[in-house]
Amino acid sequence: MINLELIEKKIKDLTNQLNEANYEYYVKSNPKLTDQQYDALLKELLVLEKKFPQFTLPYSPTLKIGGFVEKKFSTVKHTSAMMSLANAFNLKELKAFYDRIAKKFSSFSMVSELKIDGVAVSLKYKKGILFQALTRGNGVWGEEITKNVQTIKQVPLKLTQPLDLEVRGEIYLSNSSFQKLNQQRKIAQQPLFSNPRNAASGTIRQLNSSIVAQRNLSIFIYSIQNPYLLKSTQEETLTFLASLGFSVNPYYKCSSSFEELEIKIQELEKLQQNLDYNTDGVVVKINELNLHDSIGKTTKSPKWAIAYKFATKNSESVVQEIIFQVGRSGMLTPVCKIIPVMVDGSLVSKVVLHNYDYICKKDIRLKDYVQVHKAGSVIPEIKEVIKSKRPSDSKPFAMITQCPSCHSLLNKNKGEVDYFCINKNCLEQKIQKLIHFVSKNAMDIDTLGNQTLITFFNQKLIENPSDIYLLKNNLDVLQKINGFGAKKVQNILTSVEKSKNKSLENVLFGLGIKHVGLKVSQVLTKHFDSIEILQKTTLENLESIKSIPEIGEKIALSLQKYFQNPLHLEEITKLKQLGVSFKSTTTSQIKAPNFFTNKKVVLTGSLQNYTRSQIKKLLIQKGAIINDALSSQTHLLITGANPGSKLQKAKTLNIQIIEEKELEELIQEK
């Protein structure tokens, strides 16, 4: 008779032994088992798990073999946004970052980590067991790729401690694995990947995890998201991550002055040239984690870190043509067509030139020979014109005077660099607005691709976003269009119907309000759970919009201008009548009228239980308007330890003053 207890113990012992061997081999580069010994133990475990699947552990190393096939990836909201980093393309910009921190803090240090050229990922563990892995996605929502990540040898399926935590890192493909993969694809007559990053990105989104397992992806982990697990410094955090079993890039350096930082970066730049994986710079972080909250963040990136980009290699090409693209706002963007050339591993045939002033400053002309590189190792850019090769009949490039779409005269405001087509009936502007409205981060109607939208626009089926939701009334017309059968049309209508339930942040972004990108939309929907409340507050109490951290005057005025336009209000009304929700999917943070509603509040001194940003957020959620300076219009002064001159001024102006204890009581009132 089979002893099931012994079988269960054997499976557990083999699992632990093999996981330990994986850690020794892939993370510590110090294998204790030979390949033959490892393979024999793995084969034994596979046989036992097949016969007794009830004893298979959720962190079994057999998961790294793959075999699970997804139909599609589900989308999951990140616990906290996966933000991008601001860039420094030279030492001057890096020095500006350093000086900004040095003005605020007399003593701090920095950690410089290699910026791995890969794919950002978030890993979540429960009681030390990996249970979820997400791509970065748009920073707020990511795709679940757990089965694929389980196949990566360096990812611990079980930590050395039974912790609940979330970590973030970068998945990458080594250069040697990339070359091997492309050799295999060449033999199989499959398209080759242009560079290791694209190969890693394409691999991690494979629906079949067996394919992922074969491609030998790697990973480095660099941060913990759980505040209660944070150490005092980033340096200590990296050491802690390594102790949990994570693969941490060993090439990080600490510095306490800008001069020292410069030296460390030079060392890292020299070192990375001999590595078997690609990097595109160094991430400089303030080492002391307790300073991060005070330093703050923008809607897009933390202010306590910056990505310093290494200089990239140049490739030579020739300017063939300069064309102008019309955006949804009417702004014209010049694009340079060049003879296709390989730049940092990918073929480049077009380079964005930003604006006409940029063309003049660089003196870019037709038929010029130019040096092309990738700014930040990502965006193709003309680094310089090779004037020694310029043709003798060359002439400076002359700005066009008419819109390339509608031929209206262009407009340029005094003091600005951009040219605009101000014809609101410009067809290209309307098409670009529709393309933006259906885009992934807006309404995400993926069945309405650019060409389909243009076809429907030319057929006069769609002119404004609201017309998209009337397509179902034109079923017969749609099915008569060449290439649009009943099934394709039904797929479009299904996607359109589904989009009606998109969150307010997506709809706001889709409306294309000037200065209101996805990040700003997300900030606004944390404070307003419907378009009606946002509109009413914008028109009646603009100061409360301005006082929201990360919004400010420019965005507030842009919102005001948008909601004052009757055509915009008419379009919003149509969209609502056609079923678009305009509601936040998160719980409303707007409170019922209370003590703080519409009160102008000023803060002074240090609070014991709140940081300045925390208390500002709480007060704004209560409906308060936060001001920096006291005036006769101020309703309330909140004081903490070591208040400044504002306290005496408030007494002189007879402004109500409350301390932290009373503040907490008022905040807790319903």
From Swiss-Prot:
Residues 591-670 form the BRCT domain. It is an enzyme of class 6 (ligase). NCBIfam families: dnlj, PRK07956.1. Zn(2+) binds at C403, C406, C421, C426. The keyword Secreted does not apply. Its EC number is 6.5.1.2. This is DNA ligase. Keywords: DNA damage, DNA repair, DNA replication, Ligase, Magnesium, Manganese, Metal-binding, NAD, Zinc. The active site is at K115 (n6-amp-lysine intermediate). Belongs to the NAD-dependent DNA ligase family. LigA subfamily. DNA ligase that catalyzes the formation of phosphodiester linkages between 5'-phosphoryl and 3'-hydroxyl groups in double-stranded DNA using NAD as a coenzyme and as the energy source for the reaction. It is essential for DNA replication and repair of damaged DNA. It comes from Phytoplasma australiense. It catalyses: NAD(+) + (deoxyribonucleotide)n-3'-hydroxyl + 5'-phospho-(deoxyribonucleotide)m = (deoxyribonucleotide)n+m + AMP + beta-nicotinamide D-nucleotide. One of its GO terms (cellular component) is cytosol. Signal peptide: none annotated. Its cofactor is Mg(2+); Mn(2+). GO terms for molecular function: DNA ligase (NAD+) activity; metal ion binding. CDD domains: BRCT_DNA_ligase_like, LIGANc. NAD(+) binds at D35, Q36, Q37, Y38, D39, S84, L85, E113, R136, E170, K285, K309. One of its GO terms (biological process) is DNA repair.
